[in-house]
């Protein structure tokens, strides 16, 4: 398991800023939460993203939320949804590598 809290996930364009939370009890699975469109101000700190992550954590799931490229401390530039698909895959790969049986 990966240490929980703020972290950076290596990405082809540099890194993705992320927050990983694990429940206090044995977890039942993992979840990835993505934020709204960044050109509209979306970040992983959006209240809907935060509350969704909190709800998933309360339900016993590991919750990973992250900033897409060019948002917050994530590197790269906005790519009109093309590169952002790679960001989702990178975050999913991170979860698969660190929680292989989930």
Name every feature range the model reports, one short phrase each:
Residues 15-101:
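Serine-hydrolase catalytic machinery in alpha/beta-hydrolase-like enzymes
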Residues 1-7:
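A domain-start/cap signature at the N-terminus of enzymes
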Residues 10:
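Pyridoxal 5′-phosphate
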Residues 1, 13-15:
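Short amphipathic alpha-helical surface micro-motifs
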């Amino acid at each position: 398991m990966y240490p929980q809290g703020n972290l950076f996930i290596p990405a082809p364009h540099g890194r993705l800023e992320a927050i990983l939370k694990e429940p206090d009890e044995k977890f039942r699975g993992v979840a990835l939460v993505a934020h709204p469109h960044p050109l509209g101000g979306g970040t992983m700190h959006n209240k809907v993203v935060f509350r969704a992550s909190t709800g998933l954590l309360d339900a016993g799931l590991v919750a990973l939320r992250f900033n897409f490229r060019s948002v917050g401390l994530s590197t790269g530039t906005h790519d009109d949804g093309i590169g952002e698909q790679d960001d989702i895959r990178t975050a999913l790969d991170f979860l698969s590598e660190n929680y292989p049986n989930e």
